[in-house]
């Protein structure tokens, strides 16, 4: 490992001890925002420090094994230990490089998840419902909280569009690669001839950010319309115009919210989603400029970018970005998404490492 990387790891080890001491100080404990920020930093540094300590121990073990080579009785065992130790050190160095990659500050935040029916009519809306259920089950398995912000029901089930806020640790970091086009191939329940239909939905994942970090929105740039809500899931039909539609005139972004009975609450929710959308568009533009010379697994921001196909007759799901095919569709639709998400995360990290190597 390069001396510069070892020096950086030693500095982080010192910072880990420093943060540990700070977390025990009464002034820090009394300041909840600072305490949370330091706790997050401590958790990240703990992973790096633990891995670095394992690497240091492996290096010491290698030196001990090399000294044993001079002893004829111990030589065979020493050679075996050196071989195993070399593999261990290489694996730890790879892990440390990943841990040292620049962190996306949004990764630890919650997110807004949008699922929208695309081509395919009723079947697309039904599939949008299936996708939302899939993400909800995944969130449940991670002990995240899902709150529906707005939902427009499909005529025969599912959703024309559903927006939810998902809260918890590391939500955005896990779900941000889900943005893009999701295609389904299956025989609809209404199909009497048994023909396979192809439908599509689009998914957008945007980081939830504190109000202080949201972009400044000029009230003059907003057109706010009220309309009568059909209520969440078609229930509790309102007799007042409590639903809100906000249009951001400079960008054309439109957000609707009708989940609450209170117009004030719907407006607050819609504004938070609008702010997240505007910020996401700005971040996406910057990422595209930075990654213009290499592929961007986060997608182009174009909802029509197809990232995944779900083929029900074959029980197959394919991620087109990394050419990954799994025959575990039933498990995936039940929310077991790590087998799809983790390979994309790893590929993204490999791309980051390659980009850093090019810079060096």
UniProtKB/Swiss-Prot annotation:
Q: Name one GO cellular component term.
A: cytoplasm
**Modification comment:** Methylated by PrmC. Methylation increases the termination efficiency of RF1.
Q: Does the keyword Cell membrane apply?
A: no
InterPro entries, per this entry? PCRF, Pep_chain_release_fac_I, Pep_chain_release_fac_I_sf, Prokaryotic/Mito_RF, RF-1
* Modification N5-methylglutamine occurs at: 235
One Pfam family for this entry, by name? Answer: RF-1
State where the protein is found: Cytoplasm
Ranges of Basic and acidic residues composition bias in the record = 284-293
Does Mitochondrion count among this protein's keywords? no
Region listing for Disordered, in residue ranges? 284-305
The molecular function terms in GO held by this entry are: translation release factor activity, codon specific
Q: Main localisation, per the record?
A: cytoplasm
Q: Which UniProt keywords apply?
A: Cytoplasm, Methylation, Protein biosynthesis
Q: What does this protein do?
A: Peptide chain release factor 1 directs the termination of translation in response to the peptide chain termination codons UAG and UAA.
Which NCBIfam families does the record match to this protein? prfA (TIGR00019), PRK00591.1 (NF001859)
Q: Which family does it belong to?
A: Belongs to the prokaryotic/mitochondrial release factor family.
Name of the protein in question: Peptide chain release factor 1
Source species? Pectobacterium carotovorum subsp. carotovorum (strain PC1)
* Lineage of producing organism: Bacteria, Pseudomonadati, Pseudomonadota, Gammaproteobacteria, Enterobacterales
Q: Which gene encodes it?
A: prfA
């Amino acid at each position: 490992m390069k001396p510069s990387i070892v020096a950086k790891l030693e500095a982080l080890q010192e910072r880990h001890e420093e943060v540990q001491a700070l977390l025990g100080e009464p002034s820090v404990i009394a300041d909840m925002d600072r305490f949370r920020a330091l706790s997050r930093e401590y958790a990240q540094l703990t992973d790096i420090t633990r891995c670095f300590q394992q690497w240091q121990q492996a290096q010491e073990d290698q030196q001990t094994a090399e000294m044993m080579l001079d002893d004829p009785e111990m030589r065979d065992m020493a050679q075996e230990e050196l071989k195993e130790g070399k593999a261990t050190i290489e694996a730890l160095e790879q892990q440390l490089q990943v841990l040292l990659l620049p962190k996306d500050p949004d990764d630890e935040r919650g997110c807004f998840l949008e699922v929208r029916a695309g081509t395919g009519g009723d079947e697309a809306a039904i599939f949008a419902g299936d996708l939302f259920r899939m993400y909800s089950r995944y969130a449940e398995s991670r002990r995240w909280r899902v709150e529906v912000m707005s939902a427009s029901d499909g005529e025969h089930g599912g959703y024309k569009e559903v927006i939810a806020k998902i809260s918890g640790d590391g939500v955005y970091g896990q779900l941000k690669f889900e943005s893009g086009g999701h295609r389904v191939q299956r025989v609809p329940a209404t199909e009497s001839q048994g023909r396979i239909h192809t439908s599509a939905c689009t998914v957008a994942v945007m980081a939830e950010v504190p109000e202080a970090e949201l972009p400044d929105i000029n009230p003059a740039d907003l057109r706010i319309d009220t309309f009568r809500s059909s209520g969440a899931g078609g229930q509790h039909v309102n007799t007042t115009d409590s639903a809100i539609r906000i249009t951001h005139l400079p960008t054309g972004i439109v957000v609707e919210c009708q989940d609450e009975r209170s117009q004030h609450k719907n407006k607050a929710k819609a504004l938070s989603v609008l702010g997240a959308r505007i910020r996401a568009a700005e971040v996406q533009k910057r990422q595209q400029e930075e990654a213009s010379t290499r592929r961007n697994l986060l997608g182009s921001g174009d909802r029509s970018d197809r990232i995944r196909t779900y083929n029900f007759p074959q029980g197959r799901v394919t991620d087109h970005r990394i050419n990954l095919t799994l025959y575990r569709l039933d498990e995936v639709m039940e929310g077991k998404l790590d087998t799809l998400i983790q390979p994309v995360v790893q590929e993204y990290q490999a791309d980051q490492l390659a980009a850093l190597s090019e810079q060096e």
